[in-house]
Amino acid sequence: MRLEIKDLHVHYGKIEAIKGVSVVVNEGEIVTLIGANGAGKTTMLKTISGLRPVTSGQILFNGEDISKMPAHKRADLGLAQAPEGRGIFVGMSVLENLEMGKYNRKDRKKEMAEDLEKVYHLFPRLKERAFQAGGTLSGGEQQMLAIGRALMSRPKVLLLDEPSMGLAPLMIQNIFNIITEINKTGVTILLVEQNAQQALQRAHRAYVLEVGHVVKEAKAQDLLNDPAVRAAYLGTGAH
């Protein structure tokens, strides 16, 4: 299942936020987009998932142009997003939040129960707190819930927007371990992340965005060792 973005342009009113970006995510990969605030990373994910309109360019999902397709149709094809800010329903229980993730599913209760157990296996804390309101969870637990809800739709490609935002270092490590585990089950991942160190350590390939442009693309390990990337995004110079 290949996701390909070709020469994408996206506007907010008269302001061009994405300026001719091309990105490829091959089946089975973790690909990360890194860059400073305002680089266009979140806009990219919103546009891919159908929450922002395309000005020009193409979004191809397994060869099919989905650029004009409504968000729910894209979800039916196998795109799922865990958004920035998590977007959980604070007044609903953990279980109810997870059940919201399967709104596009038409399979039997047995299969849905199996998927719920898979989510609980990845995130045991969610099982412990199944009947707690989402709003009572810690930031890390809410992030687990957002990812778990996205997984309930059985995605082929998972879009993750800033999963480490606002989390303590130990929880960040935990979340990235789980992202790696999800990928090993066969889910392709496009990851937007300001924690460039963790993102580049986990990804197969990476793109660097600056003010709506791709300025670098390479294997993640190569970017991790790139002196310019280290100085700009990892807080270190060349060694």
Regions found by a protein language model. Give the residues of each.
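Glycine-rich phosphate-binding loops of nucleotide-dependent enzymes
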Residues: M1-H239
